[in-house]
Design a protein with these regions (language model features):
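N-terminal Rossmann-fold NAD(P) dinucleotide-binding loop
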Residues: 12-13
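Glycine-rich FAD pyrophosphate-binding loop
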Residues: 4-8, 17-41
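Conserved N-terminal helical subregion
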Residues: 65-117
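N-terminal FAD cofactor-binding segment of flavoenzymes
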Residues: 37-75
């Protein structure tokens, strides 16, 4: 089966890679790659989504940072309040740099013969 994807973004690249592993032929249509570098952007991936992605992208968790606690400080005049998320130290999500994630998925996509640009 042949699938056409529009756009050369993270979602399209992940979808193309996963479908190619299931023996679909993929064509990705996009304009020239944007020269924007998002070296300060990060993504938060939940534990369940990371587990799913690791079925297709080996060792992805090695490139992530585990976040198990978030503290928010609210300063409003005389009131200083701190909100703590996840006092149980359960993994909330994993952070990965956007450009690093794109590099990983583009490398995987470029190795697949059934994905065309």
């Amino acid at each position: 089966m042949k699938v056409c994807l529009i756009g050369n973004n993270l979602t399209s690249l992940i979808l193309a890679y996963i479908l190619s592993k299931k023996n679909f032929n993929i064509e990705i249509y996009s304009l020239k790659s944007s020269k924007h570098v998002f070296n300060t952007r990060t993504l938060g991936i939940t534990a369940s989504n990371l587990k799913y992605l690791e079925k297709y992208l080996d060792n992805l968790s090695r490139n992530t940072n585990c976040i198990d606690e978030i503290k928010v400080l609210i300063q409003n005049g005389k009131i200083n309040e701190e909100i703590l998320f996840n006092q149980n130290s359960i993994n909330l999500f994993n952070m990965i740099k956007y450009d690093q994630f794109i590099k990983i998925i583009k490398k995987k996509v470029s190795q697949k013969k059934n994905i065309l640009f």
